[in-house]
C-alpha cells in the first residue's frame, strides 16, 4: 500500500493510552478507537476520552473500507449500559459518544440498548451530553423513535461516501436510506443536532462531494465531518488518493458556505474525534 504522508503520522503517550485501555478491559467495554484502528486513539486516550462501541465488536455488515470484524455477533450484554456509565463517570467525561457495530440481527438494530445506555449515563453523570452514532437500523422509524425518545443531544449517522460509490463501497447500506433516517430524526425532534460524515480518497470527485453536501444539508443535517480514508489492508477498498490539508480546508469552506452549522474537515478528523467541539461551536449547550 502507498506510504502515508507526514501529516498522517501521529505520536502519543503510551502510559495514558494504557490507563484508559485498562479501564475498558476491567469493565468489559469495547471502543471504536481500537476496533476500527483509529489513528486518533493515542490523542483521545491521552485526554481520557473514548468512543464507546456498544453491542460487541463484530458487525453483521461487510463494508469494504472498514476494519471492524464481520461475522455472527454475540447477544447484547445487559450490563453494558451501566458499565459504560461507570466508565464515563470515572473518566469525568462532559460529552459521551456511543457507537456500535451494525446489528442487523437484532429486531430494532440495537436501538433499545442505545436508549438504556443513554439513561444510565444521565443517571450517573448529570449534565453530561450524549452523542449517538447509530447504524441506519434498516430505515426502521420505530427503531429510530426509541433513540429519539432518549433524546441524545446529537444523532449521528454517517453517509461515508458519495452516491456514485455507495453500492460498491457499502453493499449492504443505502444512500437514500441514510438520508431518510437523518431527515426523520430532525423532523421528529428538531432540537436534536443531526450529524453525518464522509471520507475522501475512495475515488470520488469534487463535484460529487459538493452534491453530497447538498443532499445531507437538504435533510436538515447540522454538523458535517470530512476525513481521509485510510486503507486498513490490501483486502480492503483500494485507496485512490491522499488529499492534502489544503484540500480539507477548501472542503470546509465550501460546506460552511452552503450552510452547515459546524464542519470538522481534516485528514485525521473522524466522526467522533473532538465531538464536543461541535456543541461548543453551535452554542446550544455550552
Residue ranges and their predicted role:
Residues 68-83, 90-141, 147-181, 195, ...:
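Core AdoMet radical
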Residues 59, 102-105, 137, 203, ...:
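Short, glycine/serine-rich, charged loops/turns that create anion-binding
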Residues 62, 106, 165, 234, ...:
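Glycine/Thr-rich phosphate-binding loops of Rossmann-like dinucleotide-binding domains
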Residues 1-51, 55, 82, 86, ...:
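Auxiliary Fe-S-binding modules of radical SAM enzymes
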Residues 38, 59, 63-66:
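Short cysteine clusters
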Residues 64, 167, 207:
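Alpha-helical elements of the RecA-like P-loop NTPase motor core of helicases
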Residues 43-46, 64, 68-71:
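Short functional micro-motifs and their immediate structural scaffolds
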Amino acid at each position: 500500500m502507498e506510504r502515508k504522508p507526514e501529516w498522517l503520522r501521529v505520536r502519543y503517550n503510551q502510559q495514558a493510552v494504557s490507563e484508559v485501555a485498562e479501564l475498558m478491559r476491567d469493565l468489559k467495554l469495547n471502543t471504536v478507537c481500537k476496533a476500527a484502528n483509529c489513528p486518533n486513539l493515542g490523542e483521545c486516550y491521552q485526554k481520557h476520552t473514548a468512543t464507546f462501541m456498544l453491542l460487541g465488536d463484530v458487525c453483521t455488515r461487510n463494508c469494504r473500507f472498514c476494519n471492524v470484524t464481520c461475522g455472527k455477533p454475540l447477544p447484547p450484554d445487559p450490563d453494558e449500559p451501566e458499565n459504560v456509565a461507570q466508565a464515563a463517570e470515572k473518566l469525568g467525561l462532559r460529552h459521551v459518544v456511543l457507537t456500535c457495530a451494525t446489528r442487523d440481527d437484532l429486531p430494532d438494530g440495537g436501538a433499545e440498548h442505545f436508549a438504556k445506555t443513554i439513561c444510565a449515563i444521565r443517571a450517573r453523570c448529570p449534565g453530561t451530553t450524549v452523542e449517538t452514532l447509530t447504524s441506519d437500523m434498516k430505515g426502521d422509524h420505530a427503531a429510530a423513535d426509541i433513540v429519539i425518545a432518549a433524546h441524545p443531544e446529537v444523532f449521528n449517522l454517517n453517509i461515508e461516501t458519495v452516491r456514485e460509490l455507495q453500492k460498491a463501497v457499502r453493499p449492504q447500506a443505502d444512500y437514500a436510506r441514510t438520508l431518510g433516517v437523518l431527515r426523520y430524526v430532525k423532523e421528529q425532534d428538531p432540537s436534536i443536532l443531526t450529524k453525518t460524515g464522509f471520507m475522501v480518497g475512495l475515488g470520488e470527485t469534487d463535484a460529487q462531494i459538493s452534491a453530497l453536501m447538498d443532499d445531507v444539508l437538504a435533510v436538515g443535517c447540522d454538523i458535517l465531518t470530512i476525513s481521509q480514508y485510510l486503507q486498513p489492508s490490501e483486502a480492503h477498498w483500494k485507496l485512490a488518493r491522499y488529499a492534502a490539508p489544503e484540500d480539507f480546508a477548501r472542503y470546509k469552506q465550501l460546506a460552511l458556505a452552503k450552510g452547515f452549522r459546524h464542519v470538522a474537515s481534516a485528514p485525521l478528523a473522524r466522526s467522533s474525534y473532538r465531538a464536543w467541539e461541535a456543541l461548543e461551536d453551535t452554542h446550544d449547550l455550552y
